[in-house]
């Protein structure tokens, strides 16, 4: 008993078996560590890349205007699909109604309606200028000989530009005979020079633009009462395929000229209108 008590009792005592709970816990911990060490590291799953739709820039106001302008029908495209039609008196009547509809009453519009008797036969696109004038004015030689009034002409031909006026004057050779022809446009010619020329000479035929003719009438350099024929260069088209009445500036000046006494002369049957 004494010997047993003398020994270091804690040294001789066998190591106590670990409790199942402790051993189990430690083994489980080792297993977990082993699994964590040996298990392959899962590859990082690629996050789905966000897909950004590229937004088309909204067209600016200028771009939209250009697009609309580009889509607008051109006169050349319209003419390519249809044959050109010669101008008629009704075309002029319609332009008169459209021009004055916003500024005149219904009664005033009726007064502006031109009688059919004031219209000469329109060009059917088969005539030259000389042949057309011979047809509508067969007594030109007689009229020319009896005309002796200054500051006036027997016939006016309205066109859209000075270049076109020169072309028409060159094509008058077969018709005019000994008649005196005057250029009535603004290019390189001052109004006062034309006024002085009309005061000095007897002119039978004038070819020019409505703007300059209107200015001569306004300055009392040209009287319209002796006028017998007013011919519109109606069917000719410029490089942009525009007729003279398709050009807003020219159309405006034509109506301003008509307001200077042409309507009343047509109704009195002393003035005839022709569409060449």
UniProtKB/Swiss-Prot annotation:
Family: Belongs to the CMS1 family.
Pfam families: CMS1
Keywords: Methylation, Phosphoprotein
Keyword Ribonucleoprotein: no
Residues with the Phosphoserine modification: 19, 23
Domain of life: Eukaryota
The keyword Ion transport belongs to this UniProt entry's keyword annotation: no
Compositional bias of kind Acidic residues: 1-10
Region of interest (Disordered), residue spans: 1-91
Bias type Low complexity, positions: 13-23
InterPro entries noted in UniProt: Cms1 (IPR032704), P-loop_NTPase (IPR027417)
Phosphothreonine sites (modified residues): 209
Name of the molecule in the record: Protein CMSS1
Compositional bias (Polar residues): 32-56
Gene designation per UniProt: Cmss1
Omega-N-methylarginine carried by residues: 164
């Amino acid at each position: 008993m004494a010997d047993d008590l003398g020994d270091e009792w804690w040294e001789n005592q066998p190591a106590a078996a670990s409790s199942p709970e402790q051993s189990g816990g430690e083994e489980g911990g080792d297993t977990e560590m082993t699994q964590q060490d040996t298990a392959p590291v899962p590859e990082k799953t690629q996050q789905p890349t966000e897909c950004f739709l590229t937004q088309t820039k909204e067209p600016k106001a200028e771009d939209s205007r250009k697009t609309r302008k580009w889509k607008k029908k051109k006169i050349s495209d319209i003419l390519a699909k249809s044959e050109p039609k010669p101008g008629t008196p009704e075309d002029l009547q319609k332009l008169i109604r459209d021009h004055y509809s916003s500024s005149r009453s219904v009664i005033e519009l009726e007064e502006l309606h031109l009688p059919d008797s004031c219209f000469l036969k329109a060009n059917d696109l088969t005539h030259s200028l000389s042949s057309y004038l011979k047809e509508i004015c067969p007594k030109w030689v007689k009229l020319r000989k009896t005309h002796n009034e200054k500051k006036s002409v027997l016939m006016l031909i309205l066109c859209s530009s000075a270049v076109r006026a020169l072309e028409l004057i060159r094509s008058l050779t077969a018709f005019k005979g000994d008649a005196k022809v005057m250029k009535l446009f603004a290019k390189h010619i001052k109004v006062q020079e034309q006024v002085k020329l009309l005061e000095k000479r007897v002119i039978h035929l004038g070819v020019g633009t409505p703007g300059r003719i209107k200015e001569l009438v306004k300055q009392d350099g040209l009287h319209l009462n002796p006028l017998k024929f007013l011919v519109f260069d109606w069917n000719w088209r410029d490089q942009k395929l525009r007729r003279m009445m398709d050009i807003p500036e020219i159309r405006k000046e034509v109506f301003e000229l008509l307001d200077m006494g042409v309507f009343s002369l047509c109704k009195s049957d002393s003035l005839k209108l022709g569409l060449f």
